[in-house]
Design a protein with these regions (language model features):
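Conserved short alpha-helical segments that host acidic/polar catalytic motifs at enzyme active sites
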Residues: 1-289, 295-358, 362-363, 370, ...
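A recognition module on extended beta-rich or small alphabeta surfaces enriched in W/G with H and D/E
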Residues: 270, 285-292, 421-432
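Internal hydrophobic scaffold segments of catalytic domains
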Residues: 367-368, 414
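Short, glycine/charge-rich flexible loops or terminal/linker lids adjacent to PRPP-binding catalytic cores
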Residues: 375-447
Length: 447
């Protein structure tokens, strides 16, 4: 089994209308910010060590900030980062708060492009500097990069050696820092490629800047970067000029789903959070395919591109069985089938002695598989009852019939997980100390 390094959650939003549109239709220009909060809160199961968000304004004058970030540590990080964002608006009058034009011109986080991340790591590295998104700054808007991801890279040493061989000097030896510098380097080269084209056409000054932002192709950046990646990943990024992307590994190890209509484009690690946050049906949400990238231009043009050739499907079993929300229709069915498929081994382990066995489940995420197991056990017991009744002949004794028909699969909530001490997706520093106290017994449940 692969060593778990990052099992995180990502969310990305691109508003496809001006902020004034959302103010008029939904009563707030913060529509995108509010949806990002929902997408992240609904994926809280994916990370409780920290959370972060990034935002890009499409329209900003030179000398004005256009790229914003907020990060926090701890299980309450989602609430904290959004409270910190809202603190920027506390002193506003009601008129200012509902003035989308004023917000775009003056307020931080009043943008059209958003990205969020929930952190869960077992690398042992902690601290705010390891919380995504990471930023790479530059005076050219198009060269600014915010990056986050749900990934486990297996060849970080090789990537580090390659980028240092060309003269780069990452500030830390950490996978995300290394990837940030690698993708950032390729982004620089892409901007310079388009810059040369603009100069060849005789453009100067801001004309070159606009040309770059209109013609930059993030597919080129991702092809040259990701060909060196080995492992499972969904990497998301925003540029300072308003382009955004998400790319999935060619083995389909890490999940990603996306949706678009005429108002918004959304990507998240899990499908049901999009269904809930946007109130859209299952059928309208697409899965980002292995090796594929979702690319959104500054103008809001959306396309997918096959960046890497798909390999043999190796979807992470941990993602499917444990980490993902059970409200996804496919995850729910898979977990039930898993429980049902365990029945033959369970029966062998108990020597088929159903009458003296009590069935339970632990942890809470095993509940759906438990239902599948009970269904399989019921099917087995019903077959056994039929055989027993048939063996009684044409005139069965009523008492014997009652004994057979009264047989049931015994199930109780024998073990419980103390929610206040849950350690698997909690702060890394306290995991080992608290692990022995995570589970409790329901006293008196077995008689």
């Amino acid at each position: 089994m692969e060593q778990l390094k990052h099992e995180c959650g990502v969310a990305m939003i691109r508003l496809l209308k001006p902020l004034e549109y959302y103010e008029k239709k939904y009563g707030t220009w913060m529509y995108g910010l509010n949806k990002l909060y929902l997408l992240m809160e609904k994926q809280h199961n994916r990370g409780q060590e920290g959370a972060g968000l990034a935002c890009v304004k499409l329209e900003a004058n030179p000398g004005e900030e256009y790229m914003f970030r907020e990060r926090a540590l701890g299980s309450g990080a989602i609430t904290e980062i959004f409270e910190n964002v809202q603190n920027n608006f506390k002193e506003l009058t009601p008129e200012q708060l509902h003035d989308a034009a004023y917000a775009k011109r003056v307020l931080p986080f009043a943008g059209e492009v958003y990205m969020g991340h929930l952190r869960y790591s077992t690398t042992g590295k902690s601290g705010i500097s390891y919380v995504h998104p990471f930023l790479r700054r530059n005076n050219w808007r198009a060269k600014n990069l915010a990056l986050c991801g749900n990934f486990n890279m297996t060849n970080v040493d090789e990537i580090f050696a390659r980028i240092t061989a060309i003269g780069q000097h990452p500030r830390k030896y950490a996978d995300t820092y290394i990837m940030l510098e690698q993708v950032g380097h390729r982004l620089d080269r892409e901007v310079e490629r388009v810059f040369n084209l603009a100069e060849a056409e005789g453009l100067t000054g801001m004309g070159i800047t606009h040309y770059i932002e209109e013609h930059i192709d993030l597919a080129n950046v991702l092809r040259t970067s990701s060909r060196e990646w080995d492992g499972g990943y969904v990497i998301c990024g925003l540029t300072g000029s308003g382009e955004s992307f998400a790319i999935r590994d060619p083995w389909g190890i890490r999940p990603a789903f996306w949706y678009q209509d005429d108002e918004i484009a959304v990507l998240a690690s899990e499908r049901p959070v999009i269904q809930t946050a946007l109130n859209v049906p299952f059928e309208e949400i697409k899965e980002l395919q292995p090796g594929q990238a979702l690319l959104i231009s500054k103008e809001g043009k959306i396309r997918t591109s096959q960046i890497n050739k798909p390999r043999e499907n190796q979807a992470c079993s941990f993602e499917r069985i444990y980490f993902s929300r059970g409200s996804d229709v496919d995850i729910y069915k898979e977990r039930k089938r898993l429980g049902e498929k365990l029945v033959p081994r369970i029966l062998k382990a108990i020597n088929n002695d159903i009458d003296h066995t009590v069935f339970s489940f632990i942890p809470n995420t095993a509940e759906v598989a438990f239902y599948g197991m009970l269904q399989g056990l019921d099917d087995y017991l019903n077959e056994e009852k039929v055989q027993q009744i048939a063996s009684l002949g044409h005139n069965p004794n009523m008492e014997e019939l009652e004994v057979i028909l009264s047989r049931r699969i015994r199930s109780e909530k024998v073990a419980i997980k103390d929610i206040k001490l849950r350690t698997f997706i909690a702060e890394g520093n306290s995991r080992n100390d608290l692990a022995a106290h995570v589970y409790d017994i329901t006293y008196g449940s077995l008689v």
